[in-house]
Regions:
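Solvent-exposed, low-complexity, intrinsically disordered
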Residues: 1-120
């Protein structure tokens, strides 16, 4: 039973991430920066958690990098994922040094699409 739930989560990971990215885009248009960043984090972390079957309590950049390498994901895609997370963190905690939110949004879509292609 648990393996069926895990498999279902993995299959739906991209769809769920795209819904979260859609919500993030709405917050971006409304200039609600905190809500935008929250949805970006949920989309990114949720996607890898569901796709790679990593429990939320074990999510870290190191664990995700290791799991992506185990799935034969390119180093470039792994690095792009980490950079996108870093951009979100920078936007949240050091706003003056951060990339524009529209750029972060575009990166989020790109990295999730690349990971979906490579992981399958």
């Amino acid at each position: 039973m648990q393996s069926n739930i895990t498999l279902l989560k993995s299959r739906r990971a991209n769809k769920v991430a795209m819904k979260r990215l859609s919500a993030a885009k709405k917050f971006l248009a409304l200039n609600k920066n905190e809500d935008f960043l929250d949805e970006m984090f949920r989309a990114l972390w949720g996607f890898v958690s569901d796709k790679l079957q990593i429990p939320v309590s074990e999510l870290s950049k190191e664990n995700v990098s290791f799991a992506l390498a185990g799935k034969k994901v390119s180093g470039e895609s792994t690095q792009l994922f980490i950079q996108t997370l870093d951009a979100c963190e920078l936007a949240r905690f050091a706003k003056s040094m951060a990339a524009p939110n529209a750029e972060i949004y575009r990166q989020g879509i790109d990295v999730i699409s690349k990971l979906e292609e490579e992981i399958g």
